[in-house]
A protein has these predicted regions:
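Acidic, mature catalytic/reactive cores of soluble proteins
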Residues: 1-190
Length: 190
């Protein structure tokens, strides 16, 4: 398929975004960095709307989400091995819900509810039932993370196997994603 000419900023971004698609058989991932990084759950779910529907490539949303991401999330929640790196990071499932919210803006709430409603509910129950190994829901309704021995956020640089910036507690961006996920879940359950 021809990429097109680099006439304007959008076309340049579209061409660049498509370089991050990585196909493996019937699976498709977004690379976290080209060409040196592999597919990483956090970066994939953060970039997913922009690198698919945002550039007019909804077929890649289908390939990445329906053929790969849903299976990876289910495997993680069932304690099975995952190919996607970082599925256990505290904010990953919340970033996936945020990506679905962006997809709802592109399609409709009804479409997202039909396709992914049960998965969203399962993710929220997984977190609320304290099944996530690195997220802890406290009585105040906030999520708490322990980043002393293993990075808990996007600030994930390590030295000698220890986080350079250990972030422990009620991390603001994780709780912002949590609040958003709760509101979105309430919307799809109406």
């Amino acid at each position: 398929e021809r990429r097109g000419t680099r006439e304007d900023m959008f076309t340049c971004l579209k061409i660049a975004a498509q370089q991050f698609y990585k196909r493996e058989g019937d699976k498709c991932y977004l690379l976290a960095g080209y060409p040196w990084f592999k597919a990483s759950a956090r970066e994939e779910f953060m970039a997913l709307p922009s690198c698919t529907i945002g550039i007019g490539r909804p077929e890649y949303w289908d390939l990445i989400v329906n053929n790969t991401a849903v299976e990876e999330i289910r495997n993680f929640m069932e304690g099975k091995p995952c190919k996607l790196v970082g599925m256990d990071e505290p904010d990953v499932l919340l970033w996936f819900i945020r990506a679905l919210q962006e997809y709802a803006a592109y399609t409709s709430i009804e479409e997202v509810t039909r396709l992914y409603g049960q998965l969203i509910i399962d993710i929220m129950l997984y977190i609320r039932r304290q099944q996530h190994p690195r997220l802890f829901l406290h009585n105040n309704g906030l999520l708490w993370v322990d980043g002393r021995n293993q990075p808990a956020t996007w600030m994930n640089a390590v030295e000698n196997g220890r986080p350079i910036t250990p972030r422990t507690g009620y991390v603001v961006e994780i709780n912002a994603l949590w609040y958003n996920a709760r509101l979105f879940t309430a919307t799809i359950q109406r």
